[in-house]
Amino acid sequence: MQLPALQSAKLIRRYKRFLADIELPTGDVMTIHCANTGAMTGCGEKGDTIWYSHSDSQTRKYPHSWELTQLANGQLCCINTHRSNQLVFEALQNKQIKELAMYDEIYPEVKYGEENSRIDFLLKGKGLPDCYVEVKSITLVKGNLGMFPDAVTTRGQKHVRELLAMKKQGHRAVVLFAGLHNGFDRFKIAEYIDPEYDRLLKEAMEQGVEAYAYAGQFEISNEIPTALSLTESVPYIK
């Protein structure tokens, strides 16, 4: 997935969930939009180097968006979780998700379920059961362990219930954890943050719901991040 043209700055603070103040190389201070409403643990500390994009839209109050954080150890994290579906869509198109590579038709944002939900991707293939794929972003990393969620997610809990219902109807149901951080090689659910999500997903997996985690990799050109892609599945620690 190609990233938009990026510029760097230093993070001053994040506030009101959707806003962040940054210091430009010139010393000027600017307010930008933050699309991530999660806790962003470890990915948004004062003084961090961040990368932001610019939009030409005339309707936006804040034309710049926080895209990536560069951590002190040099690792990168895409904090704009709106990018995750585009990342997975390209991986599905390119048959990079080996567990789903047999499907040829990809339908994004399809209404389904009993709780007024939209599935991120509905996959179809000749002679195959329909496959419902819910995408979750991995931005929380400790050591080399990627985790989800970084905050209690009642929405995520709902999605697990919906996926289990699809599985009981004879379809495939998959949670795909996509690496937006390039610092992990293993994955587990952060049960200490959301024990209910952990419980629901474990119960759903016992009944046939599938879960996979894929690592992310950034491309760098002239010291500027230019692209992000999913590379390979990593061990899922239950």
Swiss-Prot record:
Pfam families: SfsA (PF03749), SfsA_N (PF17746). InterPro entries: SfsA, SfsA_C, SfsA_N. CDD domains: SfsA-like_bacterial. One of its GO terms (molecular function) is DNA binding. HAMAP family: SfsA (MF_00095). Belongs to the SfsA family. This is Sugar fermentation stimulation protein homolog. It comes from Haemophilus influenzae (strain PittGG).
